[in-house]
Amino acid sequence: MAKTIRLTTAQALVKFLNAQYLHADGKEEPFVEGIFTIFGHGNVLGIGQALEQDAGRLNVWQGKNEQGMAHAAMAFSKQMLRKKIYAVTTSVGPGAANLVAAAGTALANNIPVLLLPADTFATRQPDPVLQQFEQEYSQAVTTNDALKPVSRYWDRITRPEQLMSSLIRAFEVMTDPGKAGPATICIAQDVEGEAYEYPEEFFRKRIHYLERRKPTEREIEEALERIRRSKRPLLVVGGGAKYSEAKEELVALSEQCGIPLVETQAGKATVAADFANNLGGLGVTGTLAANKAAREADLVIGVGTRYTDFATSSKTAFDFEHTTFLNINVSRMQTYKLDAYQVVADAKETLSLLISRLKTYRSAFGDRIAALKEEWLAERNRLKSVVFNRKTFVPEVKEHFSQEKLNEYADALGTELPQTTALLAINETIDEDSTIICSSGSLPGDLQRLWHANEPNTYHLEYGYSCMGYEISGALGIKLAEPEREVYSIVGDGSFLMLHSELITAIQYNKKINILLFDNAGFGCISNLQMDHGGGSYYCEFLTADNQVMNIDYAKVAEGYGAKTYRANTVEQLKAALKDAKKQETSTLIEMKVLPKTMTDGYESWWNVGVAEVAASQSIQDAYQARQAKLKEAKHY
């Protein structure tokens, strides 16, 4: 007869979380670092009681917004290269609903996080309970069903014994590099407190092995043949290469064979920006060097990439008539993209084998790599020194705003600071081992093109879901992952307004984060999109009822929370603020008023977005025709 221990469902959950370990590359560590909580009537008497009684080694943090704390949990796991996670517990109803955006963010980025929303009563005795809606077609539907499409694994616990098989399945999913993502386990609030005789063996130390899948001999031989046949192969470094920690292998293969590297947002900072063959970001937000190399390549070797529309310029980045693809990925689904030859294997293992068998191969790119890189560095230097003037200023995003309108913004915001000038001043000033985080707006494009990250894993971009509000919440997660490093949240005013609640959590627990707030008084990148496609400037600027530019004192907002704040509208003020902020022990916010339309623009790239087929505006009709013409150049699938 197996020995048992009588625990509530919630107590069993906490005990199980404490017993999970991950073994990767010879190193074994606890997999669950802790749990973020916002308690409500659905979880405070269940999971809340269990944690209060015995949290074990789990760190417990009080969040301020469910989406925010789930984003912090996701960022922690992403920064830890998916080798550790946080769990997140919420109440029923609205609290659970707030997890949907965060779950989508984790799913789009293939990041494991354990979501534990409370659910309505399994017995249904008090139905409808507080924060429960009613549907006529089913009593089994709750808010938590909205989490199904955005979870890699989803389950509902209505009996205590169901917890055992559900948790084992959830951790199998979260520790598999090929399908990692959010696991959601919804626990009925009455069941959280129900007791059960759980087998003691369920709580024994459980080790999940992160094995590096090796390619088959057939996969390697075919990959070698395709590389040897090609004259101008190109390596696309995706997020999977970063999680595989394949830096040395990428550099070695590139150097040995003369193959240029380009990066996706997720793959950036796998290889140092200063590496001679690294041509930078690819696609819509990419560099001119990378986009030119992509057009010239006859073989594209995708290493751990999903080939999103931003990376492929909506499938126009490559010469599809003459270019073939070789995809290396632990996800079989991802290897099938763009009609590629598929290698379903770990990036590091595969690249190592390729290096050992390509001793004599050299690409035909030759000196072209250095020429492309030099050309782009000259452009980067120009963007570092942009200076505004009130008579003949030409912004990077041209023909949208008149000189008069730009002058009005300069007066209203009290600034003449261009966005690219400010960003590159930051890049030059902060420590190289600092980590930056960004997610949405125009800043991800500027960062992918311009930011030089030379230390591994110091560039943390969430550009799978591009979720506004991730930046500040995520900075807290990064700080929990790397407490000794400075972390900088690079965020626009639009995203700051969407969500910044976890700044309070960072201050509360003395987890210092630095917020670099670029305020251009509006949703700048969407204004660009709107006007690039024939529209006017329509509800993307932050204007008062009498059409005046809003000048919001964001520094005062952060000061009210307890952060150390700065206002910097010149490069000199910015550098001084950055140096002083580093000395602080509490969280900081540097507010920069920057001029609109001074972010970088596209470099020989295209983004397919929906344009009205019928419109009164001739400029919109022209934009529609231009889109139709461009689609003829694109791969259709």
From Swiss-Prot:
User: GO CC: one term?
Assistant: acetolactate synthase complex
Q: Which cofactor does it need?
A: Mg(2+); thiamine diphosphate
Its domain of life? Bacteria
Gene Ontology BP, a term: L-valine biosynthetic process
Report the co-factor binding details: Binds 1 Mg(2+) ion per subunit. Binds 1 thiamine pyrophosphate per subunit.
Give the UniProt family note.
Belongs to the TPP enzyme family.
| UniProt-recorded name of the protein | 3D-(3,5/4)-trihydroxycyclohexane-1,2-dione hydrolase
Q: Which organism is it from?
A: Shouchella clausii (strain KSM-K16)
